[in-house]
Amino acid sequence: MVESESSSASIEIVVEGRKREVAEFAVRRSLPSIHRRSVGPFVFIDHFGPMAFPPGKTMDVLPHPHIGLSTVTYLFEGEIIHRDSIGSLQPIRPGDLNWMTAGRGIAHSERSTDEQHIKGGRSHGLQIWVGLPTAKEEVAPTFAHHPNATLPTLRHGDADLKVIAGEAYGVSSPAIVSSPIFYVDARLEKGSLELPNDHEERAAYVVEGSITVDGRTFDAGNLIVFRSGKQGILRGSANAHVMLIGGERLDGPRYMWWNFVSSRKERLEQAKREWKEGLFAKVVGDEREFVPLPDH
């Protein structure tokens, strides 16, 4: 459900995540939405879990391609093994950041660990895509991992914050990004937190608990997009967990199809052909399976 908030002082729109199925598990997808395609350069938000899976039933995302974007994986629970076509092999655990820039093309997989296959386990996290500026859409693919302990934390207002990527509240993440952004993990006690106001577009996604904005309460699964230039103040319930995102708008419209993002429609068609014809480099160490090109 998408609801306009034209009568609100600071809220532009609220997007309620739609349920989708990915790798046989339910996720909530907030972006893209029919009424809101992006927030700054953030073009995709999937929230998976919290969920438990039994032995033999794991959360495996098979090898698949990307172009024109950076994928950002961040966990609250569980563990995932990342592999890609440039040879990266990296476990990601709660609080870590995996930042993969697809550029002109990369394939990757994200799978449960061997122990989870045997014993079962839990999983909870976010998968986010950040569109690349036009001049950087065709850069060589890269991958970077930032352990939890390397990401800066601070206390601001009534919230404990971690700056995952970009810059916020006077603190910068070590992650290298392609445009001015902020991506912040906020744990808000009863009290308030003001959003950074130095970016063109800003939003707050409720992971757990609830927050109040302009006298209205929003539960988990809601993405609250704020009006540009307006003060955004969140008031939290006990143990509210919120992710803050924002940045400058992309330099022109973006076209999205499946896992591909580009400023040019013909580039999407090229990527489709290349994946269908097996021209993407294979995921190193995970060459036997792949996600086929969808029919539509």
Give residue ranges: language-model regions.
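Jelly-roll (double-stranded beta-helix
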Residues: 1-296
